[in-house]
Amino acid sequence: MLDADIQAMLDQRKSTMSAFTAEHRALNMYAIFRADLDMTPGKLCAQGGHAFLQAYEKALIQRPEITSHYKGTGNGTKISMYAKNLGQLIRAYRDCQKDSIPCELIIDRSHIILPHFTGNPIITALGIGPAYKDEIAHITRRYTLLK
């Protein structure tokens, strides 16, 4: 048996699911990581946290209505993906900019985890969204899901 406050959280989440009708357009957020950096699981999690948060903060300014809708449907879906290298990550960043989709490059600094993290600034990830799945599919289809 769950405590009443926890049950209330589950019930509230269930009520937001009623918004998912046939006309519903899926809103997602994405974190795309550089596969060539071989980040540890802990490092990936930290960079993903930065990616989702910074993209969301940018979206609050760029697209407040969509961001509010994302928040109102239980914070939507978050998807983590790999880009092969920095070039692929920059391509996604530029494509999002061109389409006015909120995005933010994540730049790690001051951490030393050799060989890639030497203490100098390094681009590790890209945060995107919230964005409608159908408006961003032409960008995200190039990347692979994290396993």
Feature names for model-found ranges:
Residues K43, Q47, K84-G87, D134:
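Conserved active-site and cofactor/substrate-binding residues in soluble primary-metabolism enzymes
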Residues A35-M39, N85, P130:
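A generic structural motif
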Residues A19-Q62:
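Glycine- and Gly-Pro-enriched alpha-helical subdomains that act as flexible
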Residues M1-A26:
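N-terminal accessory/pre-domain segments preceding catalytic cores
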Residues G87-C96:
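Short amphipathic alpha-helices within nucleic acid-binding modules
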Residues K14, H50-Q54, K58-A59, T77-Y82:
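N-terminal intrinsically disordered, cationic/polar leader segments
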Residues L2-I6, G74-K84, Q97-K147:
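Short basic, glycine-rich beta-strand/loop surfaces that mediate nucleic-acid
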Residues A59-I79:
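Active-site pocket-lining segment
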